[in-house]
Amino acid sequence: MAYDIISDIHGCYDEMTALIQKLGYTIKNGVPVHEEGRVLVFAGDLTDRGPKSIEVIRFVAGAYEKGAVRYVPGNHCNKLYRYLKGNPVKVMHGLETTAAELEELSKDEKKSVSEQFMKLYETAPLYDILHNGELVVAHAGIRADDIGKYTRRVKDFVLYGDVTGETYPDGRPIRRDWAAAYNGKAWVVYGHTPVKEPRKVNRTINIDTGCVFGNQLTGFRFPEIETVSVPSSLPYDESRFRPI
């Protein structure tokens, strides 16, 4: 099986559909179909900050329900899930845009989209081990010796990265460069931390190229070990791209 992984769409529905088509898929009845039988994998953070989070949810969740795509959650997915469940969360850092989109829907539409997303989140794996263990898709990455583990510590790492506990002046967390020490045999494909170009280190690649911050949306083709990108239509924000 061959896969195309996309991460950190963040409500950029138009760029997502453009990238899916550039990767060679046609969308039939809401489902992406590739003539070579390739499968799309979404690596989390479908929503927040961008203009069309609801459309992204409908597309990914709809295709997932039909068994046509794979999906693993990101930290923004986790927060949206808790928000929809009625748990106390701070509606900020992008969640406010998705919440505003939901409020514009009719009561029935809001209920339908909320239930669709919650089902997606509840039925998805924390991370995906594919191609006989040669490929791992995890939103913020995973250490080699944690592959196959599902403890709370591993969950926190997969969703939030290798955080130090310290923050930048604007409040964003400072993270360790776990990829530099990665020594596993499997390819780990992840996102979470925006980079201007896909960052390949050892057998890891960060494909969050900051579409929602005006850069580009990137897909990773496996087993080809190639990337394909489309430009963002949003304003470029240099401040969102930091050294690892």
Swiss-Prot record:
Cofactor(s) for this UniProt protein: Ni(2+)
Any idea of its EC number? Answer: 3.6.1.17
Entry's localization field: Forespore
Could you tell me what this protein is called? Bis(5'-nucleosyl)-tetraphosphatase PrpE [asymmetrical]
Keywords in UniProt for this one?
A: Germination, GTP-binding, Hydrolase, Nickel, Nucleotide-binding
SUPFAM superfamilies (UniProt xref) = Metallo-dependent phosphatases
Bound how, and how many: what does the cofactor note say?
A: Nickel. 100-fold less efficiency with manganese.
Any one Pfam family here would be Metallophos
Q: Name one GO molecular function term.
A: GTP binding
Q: Which reaction does it catalyse?
A: P(1),P(4)-bis(5'-guanosyl) tetraphosphate + H2O = GMP + GTP + 2 H(+)
GO (cellular component) term, any one: intracellular immature spore
